[in-house]
């Protein structure tokens, strides 16, 4: 059972208040993501220097360097994605527990069930990709399940398959599912506008605020319990 505040009417002010409470952990998430990116850039640069520039600079050496960089990108992409998903997971944890999520709590949660989150991300990414490959609309439909799916993965012990199945049914077969989808699309548009007009800086506030709002809305409308 989620905390009582999860079932309050979602508003801009409540999302803003929740955002202010979580500025430390949100900043930590942004910084961690930036550090992972910088480390990857340094690794990629080192690979190109050692194999491409300081090597014989042949087509083979450059091709080998490119392959090595692509392989090195895999773990960094996984780690970056896991850190990024905390933008949704932190609001989920907040409304489920009713307590401000600290930096330690957020990253402890991430490391405690690391492989569960990795596999959940791979599974969701695979399903979404399949949807986009065969037809764009199914891919979009799967992607819109993200707020509910991340919640189920982070705050419950249900299997990955059950979490996806329940999330999909909650969004597309529940009484208030279509209403939630409308809110999700509108929130996404507002976040996009705020990001564009501020040359990206607005995303630092708009993205987490949107996540807090959607988690609150999902609980209020009965998609999450």
What are these regions (language model features)?
Residues 2-97, 125:
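Short, small/hydrophobic-residue-rich motifs at membrane-helix boundaries and re-entrant hairpins
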Residues 37, 41-44, 49, 134, ...:
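Outer-membrane beta-barrel domain signature
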